[in-house]
Amino acid sequence: KDVVLNYTHTPIYDGFQGISCYNRETTWITNNKTYEDITTVVPLKNSEDDEDVQSVVTVSMPIEDLRTLVAHASGYTAKYSLSSMVGESKAFVQMKERAYRLARNKNHILLQGEAGIGKQRLAHGIHMASMRMAGPLISINCADSTPELLEQDIFGAATDSDVSHPGKLELASKGTLFIDEIEKLPSSIAKMLAKALSEKKTHRIGESLERSIDVRIIAASDANLRRLTEKGQFDEKLSNIITRSIIRVPSLRSRKDDIPMKAVNII
């Protein structure tokens, strides 16, 4: 196997005096690694009316670099820092200190606590304090769609023989994927996700081509994930991957002294 082309040739823009440019995803498969490039092809003519292409200009860049640029342009970046989270109660300070420590290691992280206590904001802060802060932060909620759509959203899909779309697992490569309400992730998808994270490879639904990924998961759960796993209600392999580092987010009622400060911060 030398080169595999994903047959994508959609016009990107009319540039260079109205000449259409075309985009191709190119996958180079070697014995050691799979490389993915995005190649832009610009056909050059003597004039706009000339039908004959005299030459072409091609520009290639690693597809992960392009996805990072697109992610930032699309707003897939952290909006909150850990320092923006206010509170002086002992439970809050300890949680924040642990978040700073865990942000700097390479483990996946589970945020555990009641709904509405700021787990998503905490995920933003951890990403911003991590070594992946220059990469994208992409979010997904397991309760927001059907299992079929959720599967495609995470892994991507080939919609027909010519068109293939990346999933958020790919788009978050070199960055962080925040998975909210992960306890509601269907078992079949949980098994696929555990396999992808273990092997650091994924494939889009409807395709067999494997793509390398480098992504950190920050998951959030309202429930005790380890307890659900013990009861057989959550995939054990995925649980083992994401529960190595747990941050328990204290409820607001357990830190009533922080309420006035939070109110001022909101105002």
Feature-to-residue mapping (PLM):
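Conserved AAA+/SF3 P-loop NTPase catalytic/coupling segment centered on the Walker-B
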Residues: 109, 145-152, 169-199, 215-219, ...
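Dynamic helix-loop-helix/coil hinge segments at AAA+ ATPase domain boundaries and subdomain interfaces
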Residues: 71-96, 148
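Substrate-gripping "pore-loop 1 plus following alpha2 helix"
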Residues: 161-164, 190-211, 220
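Conserved ATPase "switch" residues in P-loop NTPase domains
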Residues: 16, 103, 197, 201
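The cytosolic transmitter module of two-component sensor histidine kinases
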Residues: 8, 81, 88-92, 186-190, ...
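N-terminal accessory segments that target, anchor, or regulate ATP-driven/P-loop NTPase machines
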Residues: 1-80
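Nucleotide-binding/hydrolysis machinery
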Residues: 130-135, 206-216, 223-267
